[in-house]
């Protein structure tokens, strides 16, 4: 059986590889976030276009079946690679050869037309299998080691050879699908071929995140500020807390992390609560813990403003979700947020790690409700014109078609063997 490379107008058999970010995972954990959503929504939108999609993710529990139908046209395949239990993603590199071997074995019997790997370690495993079988490979990084190392420095727990592997994957794949302009600049600095890079942003479901509908409860006579995301320091919750003394009439809702029943035991929540007590704003901050995705639209609609103050953000889906709900956004001018949030039309962009600038931007919108409402309407229009999953899937499919039409114009060496601590 061979892929249908000679049928460019036919529906495609697509393999999405997402080694640590299962589309079936609950969101809010340290390693569960935007990539999980992206892979799930992209797969569904590609299936809506008539394609068959298989998603490959690592088996992290012994009782998981080999395959799980996610919806019509989409199946999640669990790959045995390393122990069948949750592992931090920074510990998964030694298990990528086994992951790649599994892919090669399965694809030899049923080869996809195109492979699209998500995250760099997925790229390592996918490159191993794709090159062995002559399959076309697209790569989306979602985050780059150069950026993480620059910002986290000694706190970066990535494997020491991550950047070298990211470069090797970028050199070996047929197309890099970047998510924003900042990422393209980073890839150029890594020396990767700009002619093989296509920008396709992440998306949002504008039929789910809508301006009208039920809203979550909110405090009386106070502005509601909402911050949503994984509870890790780089997401900037500490900056929002530090800004709150300058916003005496606002309440801050921080959404994310462990389930609500466990939130008070979370080390990051404890750290942030200590900062809130020191700042004298503990009575105006609520930590909800992780909430089900279906609750998010009502919560975002209830907010006066949504805050996205990350130190760095490879893309950032929360601004899109807020804008789709018609809620203005105050975000840091980093990564994909520089593309999605248009200052002053859909919200405000501020420097990272600057509580005073964040507070000033928030106060400016809270004190100008007509301007804030106009930002919300403009944000909704921007989502509809640029970021619906139908548009994202069409652009992604176009990148796949380009790869298939071009074939392998450049012969590349086989992917080297991966080993613990090995340099590519």
Residue ranges of model-derived segments:
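Nucleotide-activated donor-binding/catalytic signature segment of Leloir-type glycosyltransferases, i.e.
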Residues: 266-294
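N-terminal subdomain of nucleotide-sugar transferases
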Residues: 1-68, 72-78, 408, 412, ...
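Conserved acidic donor-binding segment of nucleotide-sugar-dependent glycosyltransferases
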Residues: 343-344, 348-355, 364-369
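Aromatic "clamp/platform" in nucleotide-sugar-dependent glycosyltransferases that forms part
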Residues: 311
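Short alpha-helical donor nucleotide-sugar binding micro-motif in glycosyltransferases
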Residues: 290, 298-303
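Conserved donor-binding/catalytic core segment of Leloir-type glycosyltransferases
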Residues: 217-235, 241-247, 253-255
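Carbohydrate-associated surface elements
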Residues: 182, 203
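Short hydrophobic beta-strand element within catalytic cores of glycosyltransferases
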Residues: 328-331, 341
């Amino acid at each position: 059986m061979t892929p249908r490379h000679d049928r460019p107008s036919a529906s495609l058999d697509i393999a999405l590889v997402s080694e640590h970010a299962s589309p079936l995972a609950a969101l809010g954990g340290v390693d569960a976030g935007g990539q999980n959503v992206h892979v799930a929504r992209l797969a569904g939108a590609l299936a809506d276009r008539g394609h068959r999609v298989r998603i490959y993710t690592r088996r992290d529990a012994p009782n998981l079946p080999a395959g799980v139908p996610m919806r019509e046209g989409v199946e999640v395949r669990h790959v045995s690679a390393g122990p069948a239990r949750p592992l931090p993603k920074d510990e998964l590199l030694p298990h990528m050869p086994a992951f790649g071997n599994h892919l090669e074995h399965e694809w030899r019997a049923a080869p996809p037309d195109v492979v699209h790997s998500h995250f760099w370690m997925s790229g390592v495993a996918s490159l191993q299998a794709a090159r062995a079988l002559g399959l076309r490979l697209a790569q989306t990084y979602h985050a780059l080691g150069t950026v993480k190392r620059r910002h986290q420095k000694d706190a970066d727990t990535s494997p020491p050879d991550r950047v070298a592997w990211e470069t090797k994957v970028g050199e070996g794949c047929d197309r890099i699908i970047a998510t924003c302009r900042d990422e393209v600049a980073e890839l150029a600095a890594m020396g990767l071929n700009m002619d093989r890079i296509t920008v396709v942003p992440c998306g949002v479901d504008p039929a789910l995140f809508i301006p009208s509908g039920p809203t979550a409860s909110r405090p009386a006579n106070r502005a509601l500020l909402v911050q949503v995301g994984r509870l890790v320091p780089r997401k900037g919750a500490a900056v929002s807390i530090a800004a709150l003394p300058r916003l005496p009439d606002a309440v801050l809702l921080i959404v994310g992390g462990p389930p609500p029943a466990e939130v008070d035991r979370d080390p990051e929540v404890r750290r942030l609560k200590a900062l809130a007590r020191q700042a004298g704003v503990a009575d105006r901050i609520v930590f909800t813990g992780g909430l089900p995705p279906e609750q998010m639209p009502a919560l975002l609609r209830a907010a006066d403003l949504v805050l996205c103050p990350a130190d760095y953000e490879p893309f950032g889906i929360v601004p899109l979700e807020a804008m789709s709900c018609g809620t203005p956004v105050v975000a840091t001018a980093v990564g994909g947020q520089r593309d999605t949030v248009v200052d002053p039309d859909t919200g405000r962009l501020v420097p990272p790690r600057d509580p005073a600038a964040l507070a000033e931007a928030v106060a400016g919108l809270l004190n100008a409700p007509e301007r804030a409402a106009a930002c919300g309407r403009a944000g909704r229009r921007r989502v509809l014109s640029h970021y619906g999953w139908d548009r994202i899937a069409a652009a992604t499919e176009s990148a796949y078609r380009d790869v298939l039409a071009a074939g392998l114009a450049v012969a590349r060496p086989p992917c080297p063997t991966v080993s613990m601590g090995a340099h590519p």
